[in-house]
Amino acid sequence: MMRSHYCGALNRGNIGQEVTLSGWVHRRRDLGGLIFIDMRDREGIVQVCFDPKYQEALTAAADLRNEFCIQIKGEVTARPGNQINKNMATGEVEVLAKALSVYNASDVLPLDFNQNNTEEQRLKYRYLDLRRPEMAQRLKTRAKITSFVRRFMDDHGFLDIETPMLTKATPEGARDYLVPSRVHKGKFYALPQSPQLFKQLLMMSGFDRYYQIVKCFRDEDLRADRQPEFTQIDVETSFLTAPEVRAIMENMIRGLWLNILGADLGKFPIMTWNEAMTRFGSDKPDLRNPLEIADVADIVKDVDFKVFADPANDANGRVSVIRVPNGASITRKQIDEYTQFVGIYGAKGLAWLKVNDVNAGLEGVQSPIAKFLSEEKIKAIFDRTSAQTGDILFFGADKWQIATDAMGALRLKLGRDLGLTRLDEWQPLWVIDFPMFECDEEGNLAAMHHPFTSPKDFSPEQLEADPTAAVANAYDMVINGYEVGGGSVRIFDPKMQQTVFRILGIDEQQQREKFGFLLDALKFGTPPHAGLAFGLDRLTMLLTGTDNIRDVIAFPKTTAAACLMTEAPSFANQQALEELAITVVTKEE
């Protein structure tokens, strides 16, 4: 037997038992007549004592070094009272080693477990990085999450059905990873950005509750919380309304938090997209932050200050304000830093007003813009914001999108900088009623979610007549400012689907070429259906308390979409390229 117990699972209940442990030397201490090691496996660390009573084991232990892979046979004993370590799960016991075997020695590590290593080092030697207890714990938590999800879905009648990895390229927002076909030269498969169309086809096939924990691929510019390959908890249902789908998924996430963290998320509030953007400047608001954004365009329409008056009188403009309680102590240097910060989001400036005495009107404020405001305007702004003595007001005035994005970002930064965001809380919510379409950079309409999302209470004729007025029957789940999942009611009427395609500039020939199989399937008694998908990586980030998505993936890519350990991507050999009829064209610098 190589192992009878895990190191990290030993406790007082094992005292007196003979055990066989297998794992790694985490740390070694030579105290002259005694040698102690901390021995580690995936479940944790236990202290092992080598005593002269078992001289052969003690002699062999003298040659041990960190990360040797070893086996210990010995007896679990109680630690003396003055040696109990309450910071270790196994801190009340130790193992008296009677026999030691070395499976494998270790070279000097290129990583130092006791210090910060660069992320490049950690990714290059990922198999060593994953030995660290905190990394092992994150992957164990990820496994617990998927195990819980599978049990929940099975208990609620969902079928785990796999969908193809080699499929057809369809426009879903990001670039596809393409796979050349050897058999069909010149043609390519695409790796799926999501199983969206296949899961809808499964609903048309009669499998009314589907789920899958599935890899997805997007060839897009990466951010800190994005990976080229990522994992979704993918869900689709037939004959359920949007509120019914949300209720099931909310129960799953509530159960997940209770199971992993022992935290009760309570009932999730529901907020419209418009309310989220207006009050919080974001479609994924962090409700742990108490600051809110108020609109004051109606108050400042006629002031002699073009910075306010122009956007206030523009149908596409916005003048908004954030009140920071007790913020009057913020220095001019800090205000300048915040002004620079909102510039990142396109804002041309940041007006401010300190409330030294809320009852003194203009006499009680300090601000470069005070000269443009009357007593009546000041009072109206105070009433709108519930301003109090000692507060500071920050104003954003610009085109609606710029002002909203800038003030939303400023709200988050102020919450962090001033310690206002309650970091010990969980604040989930649903955001619903998104616009059906948004304008892209060229001014063309694009689907805010994807082109298979159904509008709310719109006929095809109404949608074609006024597409920008349509509200999508879509919903996102947000927790602490992170969008953890999103979905929608799907289009199940072929006429509506073709209407949406036309609005998006996809003509009939392109519709047949790209989506002919879907349009055909919609003709044969398609049921009403709805679904959503959760980002497993992001859920795991939240549940393990890390802000780096690479911490919760066993073998992640860098922000340049490279694997430093295997050195992927790599060049293909010439024979393989010839079989695929591919010629590599290199551009000169």
Curated annotation (Swiss-Prot):
Region listing for Aspartate, in residue ranges: 196-199
InterPro entries: Aa-tRNA-synt_II, aa-tRNA-synth_II, aa-tRNA-synth_II/BPL/LPL, Asp-tRNA-ligase_1, Asp-tRNA-ligase_1_N, Asp/Asn-tRNA-synth_IIb, AspRS_core, GAD-like_sf
GO molecular function, a single term: nucleic acid binding
EC number: 6.1.1.12
Name the UniProt record assigns to this protein: Aspartate--tRNA ligase
Amino acids binding L-aspartate: E172, R218, H449, R490
The entry's keywords: Aminoacyl-tRNA synthetase, ATP-binding, Cytoplasm, Ligase, Nucleotide-binding, Protein biosynthesis
A Pfam entry, by short name: tRNA-synt_2
Quaternary data: Homodimer.
Record-stated family: Belongs to the class-II aminoacyl-tRNA synthetase family. Type 1 subfamily.
